[in-house]
């Protein structure tokens, strides 16, 4: 997306621990590679624990300034506590991060007038929309709050986030051009990316979206900030 690597923090599985943390096939495990983009430099910095997610967000909230853009991207498992109408993100070692907790952790960014853009691919991710919208986020989720999300057929990606990422890049994983810039103005906004992803999502899921205010999602892109 043209974001400098120094501005990206990766929180994933067991972090830099060399122990096995990913299942390749039945009974076969290995340690996740730290270099995710094959440039020879490690990308994963932290294990996906509550303490580390909170630390990274806290550090960023101190560094970022008014009108900066925070992109919060989740590819993970998720769950729901139906009787409490709560959704959560599954973290490492059976920890979890609930919708209302994430809203609290993101609130300092909005208090500094920082744009927050959250794309959530986990099951039951739609349960985060209400809480995050209430604090002023742009939110796109793979599914409704009481429904699972699904992987792609035939390629190792999750369906919604694959389509969303293709929209942002204007190319898919096979280097085919993607017509996601609807108004041909040289930028794919969060609103346009969601519409493309929802339209091309082939799984049995209903992606959700909201922006507060609506105009932010219509203008916010990785190469454009709302005026």
Predicted regions and their residues:
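Loop/turn elements at helix/coil->beta-strand transitions in domains of secreted/extracellular proteins
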Residues: 1-8, 66-71, 111-117, 133-138
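Extracytoplasmic/secreted proteins, especially bacterial periplasmic and envelope-associated proteins
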Residues: 3, 48, 52-59, 97, ...
């Amino acid at each position: 997306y043209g974001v400098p690597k120094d501005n990206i923090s990766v929180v994933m599985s067991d972090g830099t621990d060399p122990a096995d943390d990913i299942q390749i096939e039945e009974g076969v495990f290995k340690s996740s590679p730290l270099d995710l983009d094959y440039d020879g430099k490690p990308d994963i910095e932290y294990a996906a624990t509550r303490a580390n997610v909170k630390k990274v967000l806290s550090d960023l909230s101190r560094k970022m300034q008014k009108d900066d853009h925070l992109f919060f991207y989740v590819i993970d498992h998720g769950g729901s506590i139906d009787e409490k109408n709560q959704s959560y993100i599954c973290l490492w070692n059976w920890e979890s991060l609930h919708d209302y907790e994430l809203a609290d952790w993101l609130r300092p960014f909005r208090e500094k007038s920082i744009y927050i853009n959250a794309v959530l691919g986990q099951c039951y991710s739609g349960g985060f929309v209400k809480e995050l919208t209430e604090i002023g986020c742009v939110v796109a989720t793979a599914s409704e709050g009481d429904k699972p999300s699904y992987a792609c057929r035939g390629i190792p990606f999750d369906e919604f986030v694959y389509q969303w990422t293709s929209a942002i890049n204007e190319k898919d994983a096979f280097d085919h051009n993607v017509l996601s810039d609807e108004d041909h103005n040289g930028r794919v906004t969060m609103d346009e990316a969601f519409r493309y992803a929802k339209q091309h999502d082939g799984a049995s899921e209903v992606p959700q979206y909201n922006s507060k205010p609506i105009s932010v999602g219509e203008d916010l892109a990785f190469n454009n900030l709302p005026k």
